[in-house]
Every structure is written in structure tokens, then in C-alpha cells.
From Swiss-Prot:
Family assignment from sequence similarity: Belongs to the FAM149 family.
PANTHER family, sorted: AGAP003710-PA, PROTEIN FAM149A
Taxonomic superkingdom: Eukaryota
Sequence ranges of Acidic residues compositional bias: 174-186
Start and end residues of each stretch annotated as Disordered: 18-155, 173-210, 232-264, 568-613
Listed name of the protein: Protein FAM149A
Ranges of biased composition (kind: Low complexity): 18-37, 54-90, 245-264
Natural source organism: Homo sapiens (Human)
Gene: FAM149A
InterPro entries registered for this protein in UniProt: DUF3719, FAM149
């Protein structure tokens, strides 16, 4: 294909160069016309000897005839012609204007029927030229080739009938007919002609698919073609189908405008008009080739192009080289990405492709090893010459390879390696498959047809499977329903026999207040003891009977023990009453409740009640002061001393607080560095107030109540000392304690400094003690 396009380009270039030369003078004799034609052919120098070019003939006796739109004299009932011939004929119109401005052109003659063994494509040339100026110029081949076995020789015939004698020049048949005859003659034809015959969805009658598979695809292709053509025409450029017409019109318009001299009709074209005309013709040709390859449209122009390519592939030898790039690129910023193993035309590994090659004339080169091609039995041509064609057609249908005359491998340079390419390269290569990027659905026509066929096949197979398994499924369901009915009857009989066992058991469980699952569990266990195998089989295989699956049962309320209710109520009372009377009366109640916890009812012991911590708001206020210093434990006695107004600061109410520990600690640290600190919040610091308490029973009662309160109250983990760690000093009497306090001496250090907060607390204690006494 590439070589054909290059040959077409070189042909156009040479013809354009020839068009700039002045044409030869006309001849008044037929022999002179033939000679001129021969000289014109030698000047044209066309490389394709089998594609002659016809130049315009002049009409007789038309001195004042005006120039009309040029039209070629190529008349074909099938409108088929070589692409090179069409291009040359189009260029030939540029050379159709004679040197004399009086000369005109006659209208094209109507097509004549074929006869006398002539080809359908004929050139109509007047055999009797006019007497006036003018003649026939024909670019005949300079070195014509010998006709092949499937070609017809270039000849001439005269059409019978009245009127002027007409000479018919016959073109060689290297188009569709020649390619078809050559392909049917020998089975070695490869290339575009072979793929052209097998391209499309209705290729041959024996391999054609039903129309309902390809109907949607064909509609989509037609819709896309209409849209593309409309967008192409709306963009301002000429459509590919009307390129030739617009080109001829522009040629006529440009030739009539501007300065025109005796020999300057051709030179009235500017350089940009030449470039525009050539670009339009090449664009039209490429558009037709693209439609043929990707959309399956084969028109007469592309049909002739396929025939030319088939002729070119028949007369040229091919060498297929398979291998890898051994020398990595050394350019800066370019990195080589190793792709998959290079495959042949049918995307197979090199060795397998060489081993199953279908053409003995091919040479496979894989690396540095030359493997001769071997024909398989299936690839050998049979009597109808379809072995090679079927193999190639099958491979092209499978892998969507249209035509292969070589392999082009593209290398892309990236600054960094992309993730998608890395994932694709890490996957193991599978022979006979092409890698596609994930996320892209198959949108080509052949993939859509393959999906439609696969869906149809699946539906057909699934329908057959359902028909085969229908009887088996029906038998299975009948067996299951029969067993289910038997099991339901067995359960009903078991329920009628033992109704008194199930009901009292359920009532007993409901009275004690278990969760709803306990009664159901007991019922299931009883039924399992009655008939264990049948019950298990029923629960595992039969689910149509929903009796007993869900049970709604009333659950009795679980009451809280009286201990917690009274405790919450007392906490509220303590908050409401801030005086000492409520605090004094709360201790006996708490002691009584502590003893009552051992005598709770068995029903309360049966259900484990989660232990809940008391509220932090009430307990934090109660536990800030040790229980030893509260009025519940220590009861002060007013002694008849001279210092009545100086009461003991240790006798206080339950809601009084000590001064901040930080200030006292700082004072102690600064006063006596080596002295051991004693916390006021300890529970066993009763050695300071032993003299204020009666001896004997009061001390024993204090110990018992202290132990009971320690067990019930929340433990303090901040400053807790054991009794062995508590420093014991000599006890002070009330008189000595009051004297020390009055004179300002410290109890712990003996210094004269007393904090102000401690003095204020002492006065508050005295006032409260007098009121409560």
C-alpha cells in the first residue's frame, strides 16, 4: 500500500512537470496524430506502462467556440478505472487547451455498447481528425510490458455503424476482472486483493452470518459515515466525493480569469492552486482507502485500487523479518520499554508462526536463526483452491488483521514509566492474543459482532440446559415437598401427645423472667428428645413451615434491689439538707443497709445485677474529708475549761473542708526539710484526737464503724497510708491542743507561723460546734 501511494505520488509529480512544457504542434493526418501521441507518451514518462493517459481531443470547425467544462472521454458502463489512470486523466485535462485561442472542445460522445471482444472500459478517439488545427494527443506507454495470463492485449477496434468512423482503444484489464482471473488461476495470490474479497460481514455464502447479527453494526457504521461527511462538509472544505467536481470547476474558473496569452492558458494557474488540486486528490484517495480498511466500504475506485495492489503483490517478492531491537537507544531523555514477544501476521510466537506458515515463498527470520517454512496438511490448496484462503480469512476474522505485508513496531519515549504500561508488561504473554488496556470496551465492528454471536450462543446453550435439567429439578422439588409434609405431621402428633409438658415448662420459665430465647430453647430440646433424627432433618432441609420460628413472649420487668433505690434517695436527701442533722442520721441507715444486703431474697440473688459505681457528684463531696473527722464518728464533749471559746478544730461537720494541701505542704517543706510529711486525708490519723474521745467502748465502736465505712465507701487512692507507715507522736490533751493553737505554735513543726486559712477554719469550727451543742 505504501509503495502504491509512493508510485502514485511520483506519477503525479512527473505529470505536473510534463504539463509545464509547451505542447507539440497539431497534425492534420492520423499518422501525425499517432506520432504526436507517441511523442507525448515519451514525454510523459509514466512508470506504469499499463495505465495509458488520454488527452483531450479537439472538435472540428469551431473557431469561435468557447471553452466549456472539461470532461474526460473515458466512458465505462461500470465507472471503474485505475486510481493512477484517474489521476493521470485528471492531470491530462490540464494539457487539453491548445495553443490557439480559437480552438474549442466538442462535447463528450455518448458511451457505446461493448462489442467485438473489446473491454468494457474503452477510450473513444475520432479516427478521422478534422482538417483544421488540432489533433489527438495520447500518452501511450514507452515500454509496454507483455500481457500476463489474465490480461488482455492493448488493441484497437472500429465500431460499426453509420456516421464518422471511431477508433476504440482498449485498456488492459488489470482491474477487478484481471485480479479475479489471476486469483482463480493460481492460489499464490496474497495481499490486498485477497483480503478485499473476504472483507465485510457477508463475504461468501457459506461463511456469511445472519443479518440480525450485523444489522446494528451496519446501522452504526452508516450513521457514523453520515455524521462524518456532514461535519466534513460543514467545516468549509470539499467533501471527498465532490473533490473531483470542485477541482474541475476551479480549473475552469481559474483558467478563464487573469491574463491569458496565446500560450499562457496553463500558466494562468498559480502555484497554490496546483498544490490545492494535488492535495485534494490525495486526500480523496486516502479517504477512500480509510473507508475500505476500517468501515468495509468498497466502491469502484477502491476496487480498482485493490486490483492494482493485487497485481503489485503478485509481481513483487516479499521478505518478512521478525525480531527484536537489540541496540537500546542512547539518546538523552529516551528510555526503551521492552514489549511483548514480536509476533507474526496472525499474532503468534515467531517459531510457531514459522512452523505453520501458509506460503512457501516466505522466509521467516527470528533473531539470527533462519527457520524454513513448512506447509501443513490443512494449509495445502485443495481441488477448489480454498486451503490458503480459508486459513488467512480465519486468522483475519479472529484477530482482526486486515492485510499484512510487513510489521511495523512503534516505540514511544516517555520521561517516566506509566503505571498502566508497567501492569501490562508484568502480565505473562499469552500466544495468539492481543493486550488491550483495561477499561476500553471492544468498539470495533468485528468485536460487536463477536459479542452478539457469543450472546446468542449462550442463550441457546442455556435454554438447552434448562430443558435437560427441568425434569430433574421437578423431581427434586416433589421429593422435598413430600418429606416436608411428613415432618409437619410428625410434629403435630408430638405436640398433641405432650401438651402438658410444653406449656407448664414455658410458664415456669416466663415467671422467673429469662430472655425470650430460653423458653424456645427448652421447647426445642424437648422436641429433640422426643424425635431427634426427624427434628434435625426438618430444621436443615425443609423451610416451608414457619410455625415456631418466631416466638413473642412477655418479659417481666426486673426491679432494682431496695439497697440501690434507698441509696439514691439518701443521696438526694443529703444534697437537699446541708445541715448536721441529716448527716448524723445518715450513718445508721447506711450501716443498716449494709447489713441488709446479706439478707436479700433468693430471686434477687438469682439474676446477677451489674455493679454500678455511685455518682461522682455526691461521693466526691463526701470523700473529700476522711470519715474519721465527721460528726458521725467523733462526737465532741464540752469540757468545763477556761478556754470554752477555743473548741477543737478537729470536731467539724461532714461538709467542712481542710485548707488546701499545697500551702501546708509548702510550709512544711520550708520549715523542716527533713521532717516526714503527714497527710490530713489519711484514714488512720486518729492519734491526734485520742484525748478528745472517751476510753473503752468509744474507741472500739470507732474501729468497727471505720472498718464498715471503709468497705462501703469508695476507696481513695491519692493519699492512703497503712497503719504501720503512719508516724505516731505523743497525744495531746485538749488543754495542750488549745494552748498550742492559741499561742500560734504549729502542731507538726512547732513554729509560730499559722496560715490564715487555718485560723478562719478554726473560728468556723467553734461557731458550728456551739450551735450543734
Amino acid at each position: 500500500m505504501k509503495a502504491a501511494v509512493l508510485d502514485l505520488g511520483s506519477l503525479l509529480a512527473k505529470l505536473f512537470e510534463t504539463s509545464t512544457a509547451p505542447p507539440a504542434g497539431p497534425s492534420s493526418r492520423p499518422s501525425g496524430g499517432a506520432a504526436a501521441a507517441g511523442s507525448g507518451g515519451s514525454r510523459a514518462g509514466t512508470p506504469l506502462g499499463t495505465a495509458p493517459t488520454l488527452l483531450r481531443a479537439l472538435a472540428p470547425d469551431s473557431p469561435s467556440a468557447s471553452r466549456r467544462s472539461p470532461a474526460p472521454l473515458l466512458s465505462s458502463p461500470y465507472s471503474r478505472g485505475s486510481a493512477a489512470s484517474r489521476a493521470a486523466g485528471a492531470v491530462g485535462t490540464l494539457l487539453s487547451w491548445p495553443s490557439s485561442p480559437r480552438a474549442g472542445k466538442a462535447p463528450p460522445q455518448p458511451p457505446t455498447p461493448s462489442g467485438g471482444g473489446c473491454s468494457p472500459a474503452r477510450l473513444v478517439v475520432p479516427a478521422r481528425p478534422p482538417s483544421g488545427p488540432g489533433g489527438v494527443w495520447a500518452a501511450l506507454p514507452r515500454n509496454p510490458l507483455q500481457p500476463g495470463p489474465g490480461e488482455r492485449e492493448l488493441g484497437a477496434c472500429v465500431a460499426p455503424g453509420a456516421g464518422p468512423r471511431t477508433l476504440f482503444l482498449t485498456l488492459p484489464d488489470i482491474g477487478e476482472e484481471g485480479a479475479s482471473d489471476g486469483d482463480s488461476g493460481d492460489g499464490e495470490a496474497r495481499g490486498l486483493s485477497e483480503g478485499r474479497r473476504r472483507h465485510g460481514f457477508t463475504v461468501r455464502s457459506k461463511d456469511s452470518l445472519p443479518t440480525h447479527f450485523t444489522r446494528n453494526v451496519q446501522k452504526a457504521i452508516d450513521k457514523y459515515t453520515c455524521k462524518s461527511l456532514s461535519s466534513f462538509s460543514s467545516s468549509g472544505s470539499h467533501t471527498p466525493t465532490g473533490a473531483h467536481t470542485s477541482w474541475s470547476g476551479s480549473a475552469t474558473q481559474s483558467s478563464t480569469t487573469g491574463s491569458s496569452t496565446e500560450r499562457g492558458s496553463v500558466y494562468s494557474w498559480r502555484d497554490d492552486e496546483f498544490d490545492e488540486a494535488s492535495s485534494q486528490s490525495v486526500q480523496r484517495l486516502l479517504w477512500e482507502v480509510e473507508e475500505m480498511l476500517f468501515e468495509g466500504k468498497v466502491n469502484p475506485q477502491t476496487q480498482s485500487l485493490l486490483a492494482e495492489c493485487g497485481e503489485w503483490t503478485r509481481r513483487s517478492l516479499h521478505l518478512r523479518v521478525l525480531g527484536r531491537q537489540l541496540i537500546l537507544p542512547t539518546d538523552k531523555g529516551v528510555q526503551h520499554f521492552q514489549g511483548s514477544t514480536p509476533a507474526s501476521a496472525v499474532h503468534r510466537p515467531p517459531l510457531s508462526a514459522c512452523g505453520h506458515s501458509s506460503n512457501i515463498r516466505e522466509l521467516c527470520i527470528s533473531g539470527s536463526q533462519i527457520v524454513p517454512a513448512a506447509l501443513s496438511a490443512s494449509a495445502l490448496p485443495g481441488p477448489d483452491d480454498t486451503g490458503v484462503a480459508d486459513l488467512t480469512a480465519r486468522s483475519s476474522l479472529e484477530e482482526e488483521v486486515y492485510h499484512v505485508d510487513g510489521k511495523i513496531e512503534e516505540y514511544f519515549a516517555f520521561d517516566r514509566k506509566e503505571d498502566d504500561d508497567e501492569c501490562l508488561e508484568q502480565k505473562p504473554a499469552q500466544p495468539g492474543r492481543k493486550w488491550r488496556k483495561l477499561g476500553l470496551p471492544p468498539v470495533s465492528p468485528r468485536d460487536c459482532v463477536k459479542d452478539a454471536v457469543a450472546a446468542e450462543v449462550f442463550d441457546h446453550v442455556w435454554t438447552n440446559m434448562v430443558e435437560l435439567l427441568e425434569e430433574l429439578i421437578r423431581k427434586h422439588w416433589e421429593t422435598t415437598l413430600t418429606e416436608g409434609k411428613k415432618q409437619r405431621e410428625t410434629l403435630k402428633v408430638a405436640g398433641n401427645r405432650f401438651p402438658h409438658v410444653l406449656v407448664p415448662h414455658a410458664h415456669a420459665d416466663g415467671a422467673s423472667g429469662p430472655p425470650s430465647g430460653h423458653a424456645e430453647a427448652h421447647g426445642i430440646s424437648l422436641a429433640s428428645r422426643l424425635n431427634p433424627p426427624q427434628i434435625h432433618h426438618f430444621s436443615s432441609s425443609f423451610y416451608s413451615d414457619m410455625n415456631g420460628v418466631m416466638t413473642i413472649q412477655a418479659k417481666p420487668l426486673q426491679r432494682r434491689p431496695a439497697y440501690f433505690a434507698d441509696r439514691t434517695q439518701n443521696e438526694k436527701e443529703d444534697k437537699a439538707s446541708g445541715g448536721g442533722a441529716g448527716a448524723l442520721s445518715s450513718a445508721p441507715h447506711r450501716l443498716g443497709r449494709a447489713s441488709d444486703t446479706h439478707g436479700l431474697s433468693p430471686s434477687a440473688k438469682k439474676t446477677p445485677v451489674p455493679w454500678r459505681l455511685p455518682s461522682l457528684a455526691s461521693d466526691s463531696q463526701r470523700l473529700k474529708t476522711p470519715n474519721i473527722y465527721s460528726d458521725e464518728v467523733l462526737r465532741g464533749t464540752k469540757l468545763p475549761t477556761g478556754v470554752d471559746h477555743m473548741a477543737s478544730p478537729l470536731v467539724q461537720t461532714s461538709r467542712s473542708r481542710f485548707p488546701p494541701l499545697v500551702t501546708e505542704t509548702r510550709g512544711q517543706n520550708t520549715a523542716v526539710p527533713g521532717c516526714r510529711l503527714v497527710s490530713y486525708r489519711g484514714r488512720h490519723l486518729q492519734n491526734r484526737v485520742l484525748s478528745a474521745m472517751p476510753d473503752g467502748t468509744e474507741r472500739s465502736r470507732l474501729r468497727e464503724r471505720t472498718a464498715t465505712l471503709e468497705r462501703l465507701s469508695r476507696p481513695s487512692t491519692t493519699h492512703t497510708f497503712r497503719q504501720s507507715d503512719t508516724p505516731r507522736k505523743s497525744s495531746l490533751t485538749q488543754m495542750e491542743f488549745a494552748a498550742h493553737t492559741w499561742t500560734g505554735q504549729s502542731i507538726l513543726t512547732g513554729s509560730q507561723y499559722v496560715p490564715k486559712s487555718f485560723q478562719r477554719t478554726t473560728l468556723t469550727f467553734k461557731r458550728r460546734f456551739q450551735v450543734t451543742s
